């Protein structure tokens, strides 16, 4: 049986990413620059000769848009199974969804915990802090948040393994992918770039992290695009 491997992609850069707003369960489309970055990624994955057996994304518009571009570049649109899974959505920031990142992560949360920077908090502390400051009651506590993220990615791996293994292309979100990595090996990645690739292997019911935030596919695709422009 082939190795079971998940290629976890952070969606392309959106309007809210560009102007520094917390996106969470709210949604904005990819910008022109964001779309170009994902075309680069798709070309890079194609040039690497990777074969994908199935595709999954969250049910957010930005991940669906990202997946559409990648599948187009891979020539796989309509060729492999593709479904949405709300369990691999981004964290919900509750009443701060759509607010400026700085307000939440450099203002409210540091004041609540009396710290200098939000990176001093564990994911669990951050989740519980969001629940505390969320006036809408939408934010998820750590148990619920970590549980649905683990279940979402595990379901993909288990389905793929049952089908004989292979590669799955999964488009999700920065903090969601970071949380999954943390749940596997208790390391917390910071600043996963848009269009980055995190690779996770699954065997005998266990996950291992092969790489985090790899930008080499995008870089390779960008080089191909530049060469095509120069050749015109």
Please give the residue ranges for each predicted region.
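Short glycine/proline- and acidic residue-enriched helix-loop micro-motifs
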Residues: 110-144
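Loop-to-helix element that buttresses phosphate recognition and phosphoryl-transfer chemistry
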Residues: 7, 13-69, 138-149
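Acidic, low-complexity terminal tails and accessory targeting/binding regions
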Residues: 2-4, 91-103, 107-113, 158-166, ...
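Beta-strand elements within well-structured catalytic alpha/beta cores of enzymes
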Residues: 5-9, 56, 163-172
């Amino acid at each position: 049986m082939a190795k079971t491997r998940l290629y976890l992609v952070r969606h392309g850069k959106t309007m809210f990413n560009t102007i520094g707003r917390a996106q969470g369960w709210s949604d904005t489309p990819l910008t022109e620059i964001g779309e170009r970055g994902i075309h680069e990624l798709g070309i890079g994955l194609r040039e690497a000769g990777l074969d994908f057996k199935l595709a999954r994304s969250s049910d957010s518009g930005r991940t669906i848009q990202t997946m559409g571009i990648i599948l187009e570049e891979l020539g796989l649109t309509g060729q492999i199974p593709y479904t949405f899974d709300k369990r691999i959505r981004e964290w919900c920031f509750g009443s701060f969804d759509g607010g400026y990142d700085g307000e939440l992560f450099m203002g409210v949360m540091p004041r609540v915990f009396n710290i200098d920077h939000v990176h001093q908090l564990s994911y669990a502390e951050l989740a519980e802090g969001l629940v505390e400051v969320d006036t809408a009651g939408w934010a998820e506590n750590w148990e619920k948040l970590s549980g649905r993220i683990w279940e979402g990615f595990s379901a993909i791996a288990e389905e793929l393994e049952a089908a004989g293994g292979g590669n799955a292309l999964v488009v999700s979100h920065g903090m969601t992918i970071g949380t999954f990595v943390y749940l596997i090996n208790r390391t917390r990645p910071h600043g996963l770039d848009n269009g980055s690739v995190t690779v996770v292997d699954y065997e005998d019911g266990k996950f291992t992290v092969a790489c985090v935030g790899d930008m080499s596919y995008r870089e390779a695709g960008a080089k191909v695009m530049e060469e095509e422009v120069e050749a015109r």
